Design a protein with these regions (language model features):
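Charged docking surfaces used in two-component/phosphorelay signaling
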Residues: 14-22
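Acidic, metal-coordinating helix/loop segments flanking the phosphotransfer/catalytic sites
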Residues: 29-47
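Active-site residues of response regulator receiver
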Residues: 51, 81
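Receiver (REC) domain active-site loop signature in two-component systems and cognate sites
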Residues: 54
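C-terminal output helix
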Residues: 105-114
Length: 120
């Protein structure tokens, strides 16, 4: 299973990437929403793990565009964020997200959390 990890913080991206690879995922990375859209078009990942706050295009706008495009609307989007307030989680879910994982996350169980959201 291929995951696109869109995260602008290099340390967080590294920890998440290594954790997901250790769990058996193939990981493609992007540093912002614009780059994430480009990578999705080129790579067609099975799941997208998306930070909310990124430069150039935030996660909300990235998710909105992904869900508006019939070619990518079916790819599960999971937000990875330090901001897990109820209103923001509700906004993410209204955009079509499969779920939200809070930061800091447990690197040992990140892959399992992703699978839980994808399985529904």
């Amino acid at each position: 299973m291929t995951i696109l990890l869109a995260e602008d913080e290099p340390d967080v991206q590294l920890i998440a990437r290594l954790s997901l690879k250790k769990a058996g995922f193939t990981v493609v990375t992007a540093g912002n929403g614009v780059e994430a859209l480009e990578r999705v078009a080129a790579e067609r990942p099975d799941v997208i793990l998306l930070d909310w706050m990124m430069p150039d295009m935030d996660g909300f706008e990235t998710c909105r565009r992904l869900k508006a495009d019939p070619a990518t609307a079916g790819i599960p989007v999971i937000f990875l964020t330090a901001r897990v307030q109820e209103a923001e989680v509700a906004r993410a879910m209204a955009l079509g997200a499969a779920g939200c994982i809070g930061k800091p996350f447990d690197a040992l169980t990140l892959g399992q959390r992703v699978l839980e959201f994808v399985a529904g």
